[in-house]
């Protein structure tokens, strides 16, 4: 197996190192044959090559079974032309690899229920999956741009979805729901957007092929409210690209820290890019205080969805649970009575727990 490791920008370098450390432990314990190739993306790629997505990185990603990504972006590159910004590199590699589905599990560990800004009884036991379409919608629709009209500038973007794009992501959501509670909530804005009217129609038709799965629909503004009012009503939440971008970050804070959350971006062949939900956090980069658990749990998702080793995923997740139960916390999830640890210390504790339980 070959993994393309892309540390990226900011804290991505630190947290990627801890994920590799955990994978190395699994290699040592179980004799796994895994090779690493390191690539550049985002601001780091621009600084070294003048491009946010070098051709060499695409080659490495093509040859790998999976891609492990730290984080991309930062204010250092905000004034670059749009086509040179780090985020364009991220969108580009997603499009190149055909990563049409983003999976974001939202899980509240019992030990962290008090870390949420919501009451513990509202979030305790929360375990949901957000399934977000990743290659269509307003982020990729054409035409787009800024033009001059009369005496002022006008910015414009195009929200667009094809039936096939919607059907593809809907099918994935229904398949995942079959392995969980059998419930899908599709989020749209069909009351004002024709694009979302098509979304609801196609999702409904796909749902007819899954009679064992219950499908409901909800407008995005109501969904945003319900996520903080009663999040445990959701199991699989199906969304388009832009709405999913917003709702997944909102849902992330239900857990107490976005640093806890992994994600997977998959294509139809289950090749995936795995990254934590948080950004590059340049304000804390290099200080050793970043939470690596979202990155480590992303590696667990990699074993589950792309490498065909759900047993390795289970082992990593059990090790993380053990470390949290024992009271270790990075700064973002630290509360009185906990044991404060650094980025590398947290990675070391997960590695040690993994070796004990394997």
Swiss-Prot record:
Keyword terms: Amino-acid biosynthesis, Branched-chain amino acid biosynthesis, Cytoplasm, Leucine biosynthesis, Magnesium, Manganese, Metal-binding, NAD, Oxidoreductase
Cofactor stoichiometry and binding remark: Binds 1 Mg(2+) or Mn(2+) ion per subunit.
Cofactor(s) this protein requires: Mg(2+); Mn(2+)
Binding sites annotated in the UniProt record for NAD(+): 74-87, 279-291
Matches recorded under SMART domains: Iso_dh
Xref: Pfam families: Iso_dh
GO terms, biological process: L-leucine biosynthetic process
Residues the UniProt record annotates as site (Important for catalysis): 139, 189
GO MF term (any one): magnesium ion binding
Entry's localization field: Cytoplasm
One GO cellular component term: cytosol
SUPFAM superfamilies: Isocitrate/Isopropylmalate dehydrogenase-like (SSF53659)
Catalyzed chemical reaction(s): (2R,3S)-3-isopropylmalate + NAD(+) = 4-methyl-2-oxopentanoate + CO2 + NADH
Matches recorded under InterPro entries: IsoCit/isopropylmalate_DH_CS, IsoPropMal-DH-like_dom, Isopropylmalate_DH
Main location: cytoplasm
Residues the entry annotates as binding substrate: 94, 104, 132, 221
Domain of life: Bacteria
EC category name: oxidoreductase
Pathway: Amino-acid biosynthesis; L-leucine biosynthesis; L-leucine from 3-methyl-2-oxobutanoate: step 3/4
EC nos: 1.1.1.85
Protein purpose: Catalyzes the oxidation of 3-carboxy-2-hydroxy-4-methylpentanoate (3-isopropylmalate) to 3-carboxy-4-methyl-2-oxopentanoate. The product decarboxylates to 4-methyl-2 oxopentanoate.
Membership in a protein family: Belongs to the isocitrate and isopropylmalate dehydrogenases family. LeuB type 1 subfamily.
Oligomeric and partner information: Homodimer.
Protein name, entry field: 3-isopropylmalate dehydrogenase 2
Organism of this sequence: Dechloromonas aromatica (strain RCB)
